[in-house]
Amino acid sequence: MTQQVDRYAVFGNPIGQSKSPFIHTLFARQTSQQLTYSALQPEHGEFITAAKAFFSEGGRGCNVTAPFKEDAYQFANRLTERAELAGAVNTLKKLDDGEIIGDNTDGEGLVQDLLQHQVTLKGARVLLLGAGGAARGVIQPLLDQKPQQLVVANRTSSKAELLAEMFSSHGNIKGIGLSDVNEGFDVIINSTSSGLSGQLPEVSDVIFNSNSTVYDMVYGSGTTVFNQWALDNGVHAAYDGLGMLVGQAAESFMLWRGLRPGTKQILRELRKNLEM
């Protein structure tokens, strides 16, 4: 009798560029887990139908990327606290009782990557650029690290202020407009997607100093536009979001399989793969 192989997947649209199947296949090999992991692309507005079909046909869990994270939030029967706070779900798991739990591992992926790079978050002044879903998903894990202050800056200041209000009981956080940022920070995190179109967020280079560590959530084969700008302004170090991608994947894998895979080797493989 052949052993039943557990099925996992990632949902997104577009999904052709996703590195998740590559990452999870390597995780499975590393931890000797029998599973398959595929990329699925439902039409816009079709996520819930596709997810229902996936789970009813024996799917055990899935990752969810743009534009379906809010849909996944609605789809889950239960939510972890961090998913509830993030208002979005990037990981779904079918429990033994048939219930589907939604989690958000993005913030944990970011924090783990920063800590792996030996970035000090405790007592640091942290600037988070952008106030969209990507920003909201990482605020609570960042505040859990006890920074001196987390400043969320966004083109529309009211969105940043709203996020600050939402998370005010979790730590020292304030929201302002991008044009109001007029001082340097220890850690600067870019959650805006402006770099994907070669643009920079409309913020002054006064944010950078020689002790600043910069983190851009986007990644590519070379240095990101934002990180290049930061390096040109003399920052201490600049990292892209590839480590966050691998970190959030490791956290999802842990939720599904109860095992935490190592990330360093896989990050090296992925980087090599990107640069080919």
From Swiss-Prot:
Please tell me where shikimate binds in this chain: 18-20, 65, 90, 106, 219
Which EC number(s) does UniProt give? Answer: 1.1.1.25
State how it assembles.
Answer: Homodimer.
Pfam families xrefs: SDH_C (PF18317), Shikimate_DH (PF01488), Shikimate_dh_N (PF08501)
Q: What is the annotated role of this protein in its UniProt record?
A: Involved in the biosynthesis of the chorismate, which leads to the biosynthesis of aromatic amino acids. Catalyzes the reversible NADPH linked reduction of 3-dehydroshikimate (DHSA) to yield shikimate (SA).
Reaction(s) the record says it catalyses: shikimate + NADP(+) = 3-dehydroshikimate + NADPH + H(+)
State the protein's name.
Shikimate dehydrogenase (NADP(+))
Q: Name one GO cellular component term.
A: cytosol
**In what pathway does it function?**
Metabolic intermediate biosynthesis; chorismate biosynthesis; chorismate from D-erythrose 4-phosphate and phosphoenolpyruvate: step 4/7
**Might you name a Gene Ontology BP term for this protein?**
chorismate biosynthetic process
- Keyword NADP listed? The answer is yes
Family assignment from sequence similarity: Belongs to the shikimate dehydrogenase family.
Q: Which UniProt keywords are given for this protein, alphabetically ordered?
A: Amino-acid biosynthesis, Aromatic amino acid biosynthesis, NADP, Oxidoreductase
Listed HAMAP family: Shikimate_DH_AroE
Q: CDD domains from the entry?
A: NAD_bind_Shikimate_DH
**GO MF annotation, one:** shikimate 3-dehydrogenase (NADP+) activity
List, alphabetically, the InterPro entries matched: Aminoacid_DH-like_N_sf (IPR046346), NAD(P)-bd_dom_sf (IPR036291), SDH_C (IPR041121), Shikimate_DH (IPR011342), Shikimate_DH-bd_N (IPR013708), Shikimate_DH_fam (IPR022893), Shikm_DH/Glu-tRNA_Rdtase (IPR006151)
Annotated residues that bind NADP(+) are located at 81, 130-134, 154-159, 217, 241
What does UniProt list as catalytic? 69 (proton acceptor)
